[in-house]
């Protein structure tokens, strides 16, 4: 029996009942899959390593499975939901399953790709979410860009996306998402999630990805990103090309690209997949600027 001061998590019966009440069918368009296993939810929250001082932002709370567990471990939870029916039902669910914790919940009815600092009552320190699978990487990067206060991330994504995000330089799956995510700090796999904990059950496995934001040798601001991101994009646009060839468009010519690469102490004959984020930042020439400002 749950303590009255805590939250009663949602199981398969409650998830189906809520969906029927709201006439909600999880849609592929919105990347919706609802977690209906309390043990999985507890595991996600434990992996996030939240403290009682953390202010969590959750993207895509759905019917509230993860949200209910998060409020037990954090100072507050802001749920960003694009579906008005789901957003309207969340407070009702909290009155039913966690009335003593309902004051910790805030809801933002908005597309997560458009959410801004001004939408938040409290700036988040952690992002914990079962991300909509069709936009998981863009949402992850947007949240890290928009909220410099986020210092820890634990997200559930498709297993192959999790592998790509946490890939090391030189591997076949290392690419643009890997480099851009590591711009903020180390990216690691934090576990696997089976198909049967979801409704409806997806066709593929899921994975947990953890990012711990670190104080880097470069500024994690818009000005820096605008210099680094285009170089990363250009380097991976045609993976089989050498950096000299791949970056010739960015720098204006192959010769100019080679000069920039050599100035950054990078072999022009390498391919983009061989460089880590530090190399790309150095190539963008923004390391020195941080010290000057």
From Swiss-Prot:
Binding-site residues, S-adenosyl-L-methionine: 33, 35, 60, 81, 111, 130
Subcellular locations according to the entry: Cytoplasm
EC numbers on record: 2.1.1.182
PROSITE patterns the UniProt entry points to: RRNA_A_DIMETH, SAM_RNA_A_N6_MT
Enzymatic reactions: adenosine(1518)/adenosine(1519) in 16S rRNA + 4 S-adenosyl-L-methionine = N(6)-dimethyladenosine(1518)/N(6)-dimethyladenosine(1519) in 16S rRNA + 4 S-adenosyl-L-homocysteine + 4 H(+)
SUPFAM superfamilies from the UniProt entry: S-adenosyl-L-methionine-dependent methyltransferases
GO CC aspect terms: cytosol
GO terms for MF: 16S rRNA (adenine(1518)-N(6)/adenine(1519)-N(6))-dimethyltransferase activity; RNA binding
Enzymatic class: transferase
Keyword list, A-Z: Cytoplasm, Methyltransferase, RNA-binding, rRNA processing, S-adenosyl-L-methionine, Transferase
Role of this protein: Specifically dimethylates two adjacent adenosines (A1518 and A1519) in the loop of a conserved hairpin near the 3'-end of 16S rRNA in the 30S particle. May play a critical role in biogenesis of 30S subunits.
Record PANTHER family: DIMETHYLADENOSINE TRANSFERASE, DIMETHYLADENOSINE TRANSFERASE-RELATED
Record-stated family: Belongs to the class I-like SAM-binding methyltransferase superfamily. rRNA adenine N(6)-methyltransferase family. RsmA subfamily.
Record's protein name: Ribosomal RNA small subunit methyltransferase A
Organism from which the protein derives: Corynebacterium glutamicum (strain R)
Organism placement in taxonomy: Bacteria, Bacillati, Actinomycetota, Actinomycetes, Mycobacteriales
This protein's encoding gene: rsmA
């Amino acid at each position: 029996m749950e303590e009255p001061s805590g939250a009663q998590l949602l199981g398969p019966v409650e998830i189906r009942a809520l969906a029927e009440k709201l006439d909600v069918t999880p849609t592929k368009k919105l990347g919706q899959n609802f977690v209906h296993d309390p043990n999985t939810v507890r595991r996600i929250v434990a992996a996030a390593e939240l403290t009682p001082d953390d202010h969590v932002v959750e993207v895509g709370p759905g019917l509230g499975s993860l949200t209910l567990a998060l409020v037990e471990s954090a100072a507050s939870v802001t749920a960003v939901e694009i579906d008005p029916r789901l957003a309207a039902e969340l407070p009702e669910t909290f009155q039913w399953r966690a009335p003593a914790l309902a004051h910790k919940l805030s809801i933002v009815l908005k597309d997560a790709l458009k959410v801004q600092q001004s939408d938040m009552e409290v700036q988040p320190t952690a992002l914990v979410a079962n991300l909509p699978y069709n936009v998981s990487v863009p949402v992850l990067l947007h949240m890290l860009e928009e909220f410099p206060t986020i210092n820890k991330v634990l997200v559930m994504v498709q297993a192959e996306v999790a592998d790509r995000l946490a890939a090391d330089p030189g591997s076949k799956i290392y690419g643009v998402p890997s480099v851009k995510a590591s711009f903020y700090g180390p990216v690691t796999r934090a576990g696997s999630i089976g198909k049967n904990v979801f409704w409806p059950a997806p066709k593929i496995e899921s994975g947990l990805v953890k990012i711990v934001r670190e104080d880097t040798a470069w500024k994690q601001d818009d000005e820096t990103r605008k210099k680094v991101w285009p170089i990363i994009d250009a380097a991976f646009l045609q993976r089989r090309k050498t950096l000299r060839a791949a970056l010739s468009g960015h720098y204006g010519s192959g010769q100019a690209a080679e000069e920039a690469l050599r100035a950054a102490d990078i072999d022009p004959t390498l391919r983009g997949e061989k460089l880590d984020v530090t190399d790309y930042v150095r190539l963008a020439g923004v390391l020195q600027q941080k010290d000057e400002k």
